[in-house]
Amino acid sequence: MSSDKANNQSPDQGANTPAESTNSGPKLDGNQAVNLAAEQSKSTADKNLPVFGDLPIPEDTANLRFGPNLHDGLLALLPLVGVWRGQGQAAHPGEEEFTFGQQLSIFHDGENRLGFESRTWKINPPAEEGAEADGDEASAESAGEPEVGELLRREAGFWRIDNDDNIELLIAHSDGMIELMYGKPLTERAWQLESASTLATETGPSALGPGKRLYGLMPNNDLGWVDERLIDGEMVPWMSAQLKRVRG
């Protein structure tokens, strides 16, 4: 199945969207890629994925300073490497729009591929103020603070790219769908992909059609992304988020 998809909205009011903040630019240069990644990671340079320490093969790393060298074929994807965390908005058909939290880990093992894992969870609205009226001090203290709700979908897979910068994104969705997306870098700080094939299991999502994703680094070096899906014959917003680098 194939799909079309539109532009992105940033959850951070006042910030440009990834599409707006990553206008066309020169083809990626190795030194530029390293410099951009270094600027992004000044406060997270000493942090990385947990490691086992006794594997006889290279460990996965989300920090370009540790572990094996990044494969030369991945330069166009280099700025994505890291662990990113933040919040976003989801608008699923038949449901009210809700806020979710996300951790997105993008890592490598020295081979010509990136691995990734995404975890999301629902963020419930803050408890109503005045909870102390019920005599619950703990509730009163947490009034106004958002609460972590149910766990949502997980994704895992791989980013691959060839010598002509054609990207393949292979995604396994925890709710019972496998997806292949193709795309290209828009600039050295933005990447756009769209579904080439989706396969749902018998218990997987029957209404979720093919989609299109845009990932982009914003002027503040946050990673923004947006996903739209073909639902009932038209492309509609599905999920979008703005994530800060926390490791790498």
Curated annotation (Swiss-Prot):
Residues 1-25, 32-43 have a biased composition (Polar residues). CDD domains: lipocalin_heme-bd-THAP4-like. SUPFAM superfamilies: Lipocalins. Pfam families: THAP4_heme-bd (PF08768). Residues 129-139 have a biased composition (Acidic residues). InterPro entries: Calycin, Nb(III)_bact/plant, Nitrobindin, THAP4-like_heme-bd. Gene3D superfamilies: 2.40.128.20. A motif (GXWXGXG) lies at residues 82-88. It comes from the Bacteria. Residues 1-49, 118-147 are annotated as: Disordered. Belongs to the nitrobindin family. PANTHER family: PEROXYNITRITE ISOMERASE THAP4, THAP4 PROTEIN. This is Ferric nitrobindin-like protein. It comes from Corynebacterium urealyticum (strain ATCC 43042 / DSM 7109). The lineage of its organism: Bacteria, Bacillati, Actinomycetota, Actinomycetes, Mycobacteriales.
